[in-house]
Curated annotation (Swiss-Prot):
Name of the gene encoding the protein in the UniProt record: ZNF574
Entries under InterPro entries matching the protein: Znf_C2H2_sf, Znf_C2H2_type
Subcellular location: Nucleus
Source organism of this protein record: Bos taurus
Biased composition (Low complexity): 259-272, 707-732
Protein's name in the database: Zinc finger protein 574
């Protein structure tokens, strides 16, 4: 009985607030230590110190001895009884005696009073502030105080609300602490009377008192436990709303767990910021262990009913099933509600993140629900939630909200995205020694997982190996194959997240997913200290430091750090471009690239600077702009590709494709992020942004393919010449599967084919604003405009001669180097430029055409001569039949 009372007292722990700065503390010792910083060094009045044979008045009048020592050192006074103590630890032990007395218990004979800290031979007494009577123990003093409370009843103080504490004054006046104290005499307690002296109170029976913290605002009735108070409040409010006006003390006393954590993880202790805290973790542990012991005690009558009223998540006790159900909803749905919409969240951080959707920083607004998003891509992904069928369904039964993840999943089924048929397996067949995973934390028993039989799927491909029939993967052990089939090819997802309802195959996946709700990132990178929420994400991140790219394409040899990126890359070789731009016809294999491309048509980029009217396609470019233009600092640039980053950490995380391909493109556009190979090209590209409008200049320009420099070298001769390409630096072999419908020429990208088709259609969408001449590509227009401006940005390092086009500079450099990379396959003559080779090839073409015409003329003349010479002779029948139509066509009459 005593242990239960002590545990109950620990559960309804006090909260202490500093009266000077309103700072909250979980224990009296902490607040007293804190208040020493506010209290100047002063002497306090000793309430009562008596020595055998010496009165208190005489000791005080003498001004010497023990009294002066206590006056100088004692700075800690109990607010309940006024006793002065020497240290915070003694005051804490003294306060626990008050708490033990406040617990409801049967009247028992008084035990000898606990010994106060002995100071020489003196004894500390307790003085009544009303009648100045002295008592030898706290129990007798509290019993005497009840007589004054019954004689002059006073209204109990209002429960403390955080932010506006009620300060309880003390005789000292310097260590005032806001504590919730409301007492009343127990109705079944013994009757005690005031004792004028310590000698007369040695046989006094201790009267029990109880701590009443909760007052009903309707009927002013007092309650000790929050469960009793809530049960009573239900009588006044039969149908409370989900956000009912519950007192703040309920939230301060209850300890809900915002997130359902796994059993293997330690249970978090609520922090003081959420207004429900206990004194320390040990008190919480003792409280929970005591409740579990009482709940598991089957010997008590009604133990089964009591066990049903305990919350399995936080061990909270409730008096009715309705209260328990209402409490369980807080674990499932959350307890923090958005004031602007009806959504609830499990933690304040989730609510703060959600409130950012309502802020004015978002530019794209959903017309159905009012939520705003920072980019158009997020808005389009959110808009699908308002459609009749918001989920992407796969034929295998899985559903996805995100389109990208749905496309990733479909590729696991192979060509067509249709899952292969699986062999049905009896559910009763045992698994090969593999233990069943623990059931999900829903409290309901789940059906056993259908195991996979070895006879139906484990076909030995080689001695000692087992092959999976679904993906042809081989394993060295049957147990490994069984585990692979259970967790890779299993269609159902048994483990559910208690916060958002998302399903997972493994319980470990649920634990990793829960960290996205709690914000926990327990796996830091040893190189840059960046934290991650799972070991897999950490391992993927560490590849950026080591430079390792374990996933390599078998067609072009390009390597990647993730298998999903490799799967996306293979779509390029498969010529799978399902996303088409409606304005210019350019196709993309990823949806976000189409969204990025659409900004070039509209001319409005999503990330706008607050200090100037400029906008940017990427957030990184906006941060770099603010760093350079408004902060006057230099960004961190990649030495391989020239990309700029606002911090060195972002630069270290940068995965440079140019460095891997050894083809640096060192100049990046600060507006759209496009990289070019020279400063002149960058200036021309930025001039296009600054032209009449980005929509007019860049709208019809498809994004240039980011191929290596060697692949862009013009070495392919026209098909009309019908000859091989001249000798040039060899480029990596690439598949060319896009064919022109007019000339049957093949191209590797949709962009190259789109530009080539303008040759047949005659389309020239880029006119010069100075002379009106039109061009098929925007780069040709940029080169042409330099003729009007006289700009020659490309200068030779040897002779200083400048050119308007970089290609002319490259041809000029060959004069100094003597290089002639373009040779004629007919005569072997070589040239410095492809245009000179083209002109030279035309001479061979003209000679070839002249020779063909001469041969045709000679053949025609020979046929006519043969007819004229043999017309008078008798010819065989077969020759006559062959010559007759020819002679008739020439107008020659053949006599018979």
């Amino acid at each position: 009985m005593t242990e239960e009372s002590e545990e109950t007292v620990l559960y309804i722990e006090h909260r202490y607030v500093c009266s000077e700065c309103n700072q909250l503390y979980g224990s009296l010792e902490e607040v007293l230590m804190h208040q020493n910083s506010h209290v100047p060094q002063q002497h306090f009045e000793l309430v009562g110190v008596a020595d055998p044979g010496v009165t208190v008045a005489a000791e005080a009048a003498s001004g010497t001895g023990l009294y002066q020592t206590l006056v100088q050192e004692s700075q800690y006074q109990c607010l309940e009884c006024g006793q002065l103590l020497m240290s915070p630890s003694q005051l804490l032990e003294h306060q626990e005696l008050h708490l033990k007395m406040m617990a409801p218990q049967e009247a028992v004979p008084a035990e000898p009073p606990p010994k106060a800290p002995a100071l020489s031979s003196s004894t500390i007494h307790y003085e009544c502030v009303d009648c100045k009577a002295l008592f030898a123990s706290q129990e007798l003093w509290l019993n005497h105080r009840q007589t004054h409370l019954r004689a002059t009843p006073t209204k109990p103080p209002t429960p403390v609300v955080l932010g506006s504490p009620v300060v309880v004054g003390s005789p000292v006046g310097q260590t005032r602490v806001a504590v919730e104290h409301s007492y009343r005499k127990a109705e079944e307690g013994g009757e005690g009377a005031a004792v004028p002296s310590a000698a007369a109170t040695t046989t006094e029976v201790v009267t029990e008192v109880e701590l009443l913290l909760y007052k009903c605002s309707e009927c002013s009735q007092l309650f000790q436990l929050p469960a009793d108070f809530l049960e009573h409040q239900a009588t006044h409010f039969p149908a409370p709303a989900p956000e009912s006006e519950e007192p703040v003390l309920q939230q301060e006393t209850l300890t809900p767990a915002p997130v359902e954590v796994p059993v293997s993880q330690p249970e978090p202790v609520p922090s003081s910021d959420h207004s429900y805290e206990l004194r320390n973790g040990e008190a919480l542990g003792r409280d929970r262990r005591g409740r579990r012991a009482r709940r598991n005690n089957s010997g008590e009558p009604g133990g089964a009913a009591t066990q049903e009223l305990f919350c399995s998540a936080c061990d909270q006790l409730f008096l009715s099933p309705h209260q328990l159900q209402q409490h369980l909803r807080s674990h499932r749905e959350g307890v923090f509600k958005c004031p602007l919409c009806s959504r609830v969240f499990p933690s304040p951080s989730s609510l703060d993140q959600h409130l950012g959707d309502h802020s004015s920083e978002s530019h794209f607004l959903c017309v159905d629900c009012g939520l705003a998003f920072g980019t158009e891509a997020l808005l389009l992904a959110h808009r699908r939630a308002h459609t009749p069928n918001p989920l992407h369904s796969c034929p295998c039964g899985k559903t996805f909200v995100n389109l990208t993840k749905f496309l990733y999943h479909r590729r696991t089924h192979g060509v067509g995205g249709v899952p292969l048929p699986t062999t049905p397996v009896p559910p009763e067949e045992p698994v090969l020694g593999f233990p069943e995973p623990a059931p999900a934390e829903t409290g309901e028993p789940e059906a056993p997982e259908p195991p996979v039989a070895e006879e139906s799927s484990a076909e030995p491909a080689a001695p000692g190996t087992y092959r999976c029939l679904l993906c042809s993967r081989e394993f060295g052990k049957a147990l490994q194959l069984t585990r692979h089939q259970r967790f890779v090819h299993r269609l159902e997802r048994r483990h559910k997240c208690s916060i958002c309802g998302k399903m997972f195959k493994k319980k470990s996946h649920v634990r990793n997913h829960l960290r996205t709700h709690t914000g926990e990132r327990p796996f830091p990178c040893p190189d840059c200290s960046k934290p991650f929420n799972s070991p897999a994400n950490l391992a993927r991140h560490r590849l950026t430091h080591t430079g390792e790219r374990p996933y390599r394409c078998g067609d072009c040899g390009k390597a990647f750090t993730q298998s999903s990126t490799l799967r996306q890359h293979r779509l390029v070789h498969a010529q799978h471009f399902p996303y088409r731009c409606q304005e210019c016809g350019v196709r993309f294999h990823r949806p976000y690239r189409l969204l990025m491309h659409r900004y070039h048509h509209t001319g409005e980029y999503p990330y706008k600077c607050r200090e100037c009217p400029r906008s940017f396609l990427l957030r990184r470019l906006l941060e770099v702009h603010q760093l350079v233009a408004h902060a006057g600092r230099q960004p961190h640039r990649c030495s391989s590709c020239g990309a700029a980053f606002p911090s060195s950490l972002r630069l270290r995380e940068h995965r440079c494709a140019a460095a891997a391909a050894q083809a640096p493109r060192r100049f990046e556009c600060g507006t759209c992020g496009k990289k070019v190979g020279s400063a002149a090209r960058l200036q021309a590209h930025e001039a296009a942004h600054a032209a009449a409008g980005p929509g007019e200049v860049l709208a019809k320009e498809p994004p240039a393919p980011r191929a290596p420099r060697a692949a862009r070298t013009p070495i392919t001769s026209p098909t009309t010449l019908g000859s091989a390409a001249p000798a040039a630096p060899a480029a990596p072999a690439r598949r060319r599967g896009l064919e022109c419908s007019e000339c049957k020429k093949l191209f590797s990208t949709e962009t190259s084919l789109q530009v080539h088709r303008r040759i047949h259609t005659g389309e020239r969408p880029y006119p010069c604003p100075d002379c009106g001449k039109a061009f098929r590509q925007s780069t040709h227009l940029k080169d042409h405009r330099r003729l009007h401006t006289g700009e020659r940005p490309f200068a030779c390092e040897v002779c200083g001669k400048a050119f308007a086009i970089s290609m002319r500079l490259a041809e000029h450099r060959r004069i100094h180097t003597g290089e002639r990379p373009y040779s004629c396959p007919d005569c072997g003559k070589s040239y410095r430029s492809f245009s000179n080779l083209w002109k030279h090839r035309k001479t061979h073409q003209q000679q070839h055409q002249a020779a063909v015409r001469q041969q045709l003329a000679e053949a025609e003349a020979a046929v006519g001569l043969a007819v004229m010479e043999t017309a008078v002779e008798a010819l065989p029948l077969v020759e006559a039949i062959e010559i007759y139509p020819l002679a008739e066509a020439e107008g020659v009459q053949i006599s018979g």
